[in-house]
Each structure stands twice: as structure tokens, then as C-alpha cells.
A protein has these predicted regions:
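Active-site groove signature of glycoside hydrolases
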Residues: 45-79
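Active-site-adjacent "subsite" loops/lids of carbohydrate-active enzymes
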Residues: 1-52, 56
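Glycine-rich tight-turn/loop motif centered on a GG-T
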Residues: 11-19, 76-90
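Active-site-proximal substrate-binding groove within the catalytic cores of carbohydrate-active enzymes
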Residues: 55, 68, 94-278, 298-301
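Histidine/acidic-residue-rich catalytic or RNA/ligand-binding cores of hydrolases
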Residues: 2-7, 72-77, 119-129
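Generic beta-strand/beta-sheet core signal
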Residues: 1, 7, 14, 64-67, ...
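Alpha-helix capping and helix-loop boundary segments enriched in small/acidic/polar residues
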Residues: 33-37, 41, 81-92
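C-terminal beta-strand-rich structural cap/linker in extracellular carbohydrate-active enzymes
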Residues: 281-303
């Protein structure tokens, strides 16, 4: 009964009972449609409609989510012997839609969400950025560390949330974007800690746009008994950070890493952001091995 479904029924995909949307039924019948971006006429109309809306309202940040199961809509509309074509045409239309917006608004950010990180493919990320990268257990730090550790290898722009202002949890969510979900009115919460974490994020954020080096290998990175560490390096001014985590079951107070990208003959000052301790090392020394120290499990450091 929506306006678009009544005005343009030919642009709607009907799942004909095959979509996995049990809550979207009425009298036993499926009661929803999927707007068909695979229809060129529909795609052009939607592109202009959203583009006009952005222009009229001065919007420069466009976020698109997709919290339904589209497979049933696509499968129900495939022609015999043409399995997958409806999906292919739809995704081609989606890319065309985003390209229209980016061509019309060159400074636009397209924030791409699909049930959390389900569209982190090369074609999508060439047109958009997943500022909510996953619906994985919200605030669980080990998973978040692993997401950052892997995605940074090829995807500078991605983000997630944080529910706690403690250093270990917050630093697990570092990236180019963080959504703060702090309960500032709850007992025991510290506004000062929150402000410190925000300042730390703003300080490190620009470094995620340049060089990245994982420092602790790729084996068993989900385990609770390891150290996980990575390096952010900015060749533009020869500066950077080390971010490291000692997980709760790790027995070792120290861990040695080999830094990359540094000039062998340059001298670098390394300052522990938590203790203020500073030392000097050459790039060659840092490449040959630098030892990180954390006295307690479930702790972190930034240098």
C-alpha cells in the first residue's frame, strides 16, 4: 500500500512468498516489495529522486543500509534457465545509482551498510565506505581488534562502535571512524576518560590513511593468549604509531616487533602515551627489533 508500490508497481520485485522475512506477512501473504534497481527506468528515477533530495536539503553525507534478505526477491523473479540474472542486474543498478550520486556531488561520502559489513567487496568500496563495518557482537574487543588488523591491509575507510571508555576496549575500535555509545549518565562513568579517549582517536585517526603494517603475524589472531600489534606510519612526515594489545590469557609481559618503512639512518623518539616514557632509536634499530612491555594481561599500549 505504499505510494511507490501503487504508482509504479512495475518497478517492484515481489518475492511471491519466497523471501525470508517472516515478520513481513499479512494474512499469510508476503506484504513487501523490493525496489528494483535492476530496472534501468526505475534506477534512473531513484537516482534523480535521491539526488534532488540531497541537493534540496544540503546533504553531503549519504548513508545507505540494507537490513532485509534480498535473495528471495531476486530468486523469485529470475526467468527459467537464468538463475542469478535478477541479482546481477540489481547490483549493477546499485553501482550505477552510487556513480550517479558521486558524479553529481563529487564531495559526497556514501556510507555503505548492509546488515553490518556485508558489502565490503572491491566494487562497493570503490564507490562507498563501510562506516559500520560489522554487526558482530557489539563492543567485544577481540573481534574488533581482528577486524581492524585485517581490513587495514586494503581498506583505509571503515568504522565501528565502542561501548566502553577503558583503554583496552576503546583502542580495539580504533580506525577512521568510531561511533561512541557511552552511557554518560550511568554511575561509574568518567567524562574525563571519555574526553581522553576522544582526543586519542583524533590524534591517531589521520594515520589510518597512510601506511599500515601488521606486526604480530597472521596465525591464530582470534586467540586470547597472544599479543596483537600493528604499526601506522605516515611517510608524508616520517611519523607514526604502534598500537598493541596483550590479551587476557597471554603469559608474557614483553613482545618484540620489527618496524617497517622507516629510514634506517633517521633517529626516532618513541613515547609511551600512557606512561610518558620516551626513548630514542634509529630506524635500523627499530627494524631489527623493538620490545613492547605490558605488565598486565588484558591491557594495551600506544607508542
Amino acid at each position: 500500500g505504499s505510494a511507490w508500490a501503487l504508482q509504479h508497481p512495475q518497478w517492484m520485485l515481489d518475492a511471491r512468498g519466497k523471501a525470508k522475512q517472516e515478520d513481513w506477512t499479512k494474512d499469510g501473504e508476503h506484504d513487501s516489495y523490493l525496489f528494483n534497481l535492476g530496472n534501468p527506468e526505475a534506477c534512473r528515477w531513484m537516482s534523480k529522486y535521491i539526488g534532488d533530495f540531497l541537493e534540496e536539503n544540503g546533504i553531503d553525507y549519504y548513508r545507505q543500509d540494507f537490513n532485509i534478505e534480498p535473495e528471495g526477491f531476486w530468486a523469485a523473479n529470475d526467468e527459467p534457465g537464468r538463475q542469478g540474472i535478477c541479482e546481477i542486474r540489481y547490483i549493477e543498478g546499485l553501482y550505477s545509482f552510487w556513480e550517479y550520486l558521486l558524479n553529481r556531488f563529487p564531495g559526497l561520502l556514501v556510507d555503505n551498510c548492509a546488515s553490518g559489513g556485508r558489502r565490503i567487496d572491491l566494487e562497493s568500496i570503490s564507490r562507498s565506505a563501510p562506516m559500520w563495518r560489522t554487526d558482530y557482537s557489539y563492543g567485544e574487543p577481540i573481534g574488533y581488534q581482528c577486524h581492524t588488523y585485517g581490513l587495514n591491509l586494503y581498506l583505509p575507510l571503515h568504522g565501528t562502535g565502542t561501548v566502553s571508555a577503558d583503554k583496552f576496549t576503546f583502542r580495539s575500535s580504533l580506525g577512521t571512524s568510531i561511533i561512541y555509545n557511552w552511557k554518560i549518565t550511568e554511575a561509574g562513568q568518567s567524562i574525563y576518560d571519555m574526553r581522553d579517549r576522544q582526543a586519542e582517536f583524533k590524534e591517531l585517526r589521520p594515520y589510518f590513511y597512510e601506511d599500515y603494517y601488521p606486526l604480530s603475524g597472521i596465525n591464530n589472531i582470534t586467540s586470547e593468549n597472544i599479543w596483537l600489534a600493528y604499526q601506522l606510519y605516515r611517510p608524508s612526515d616520517d611519523s607514526g604509531y604502534i598500537v598493541a594489545f596483550r590479551r587476557k590469557d597471554n603469559p608474557d609481559k614483553s613482545y618484540t616487533v620489527n618496524l617497517s618503512g622507516l629510514h634506517p639512518d633517521h633517529t626516532y623518539i618513541l613515547t609511551n602515551k600512557d606512561t610518558g616514557e620516551a626513548i630514542k632509536k634509529t630506524g635500523k634499530e627499530l627494524a631489527n627489533g623493538f620490545t613492547l612491555t605490558l605488565d598486565n594481561p588484558q591491557s594495551s599500549l600506544i607508542i
